[in-house]
Amino acid sequence: TDVRSLVEVNLLSVMALVDGALPALRKRGGGQLAIVSSLAAYYGLPATPTYCATKAGLKAYGTSLRGWLRSEHIRVSVILPGYVSSPMCAAMPGPKPFLWQPERAARRIRRGLALDRARISFPFPLNLGIWGLSLLPACLAMPIARMFGYDR
């Protein structure tokens, strides 16, 4: 099914790749892992529930790995981009506020990795808005999401 394939591609394949990379990272005495999630990890958008669920799973996985692997000198950063111009983004339903070009996103990610940030999220206004929605009770968050066009 589409649900199963999305979970396999977005979540399970990343977990398998990390699992496969860990022996080499341990052997060399450390390294860095960058796990790409999404700002959609913070608040489940009605139009893309499976996508949001997989990205929330990656966020939790990466955050857990960071603490687990720290003593082995393996750094882990979770990348939480908003909308980045791409064919995949263009095909997604709903508005795409604060759309970034890939080059700008790459610069932000590179800087965050160099600083060993736990989370690299952008753009700030969308990050703040989505994070804020996640703190509200559903009876308030859902009408706000609908107001911005995220109702399907």
Sequence positions of predicted segments:
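Active-site loop immediately N-terminal to the catalytic Tyr-X3-Lys motif
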Residues: 45-49
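Active-site helix of classical SDR
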Residues: 18, 54
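C-terminal helical subdomain
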Residues: 78, 94-129
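Substrate-binding pocket helix/loop in short-chain dehydrogenase/reductase
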Residues: 1-5
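Short, flexible catalytic-loop segment of classical short-chain dehydrogenase/reductase
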Residues: 81-91, 95
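Residue(s) in the substrate-gating loop at a strand-loop-helix junction
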Residues: 38
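Active-site-adjacent segment of SDR/Rossmann-fold oxidoreductases
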Residues: 43, 64-75
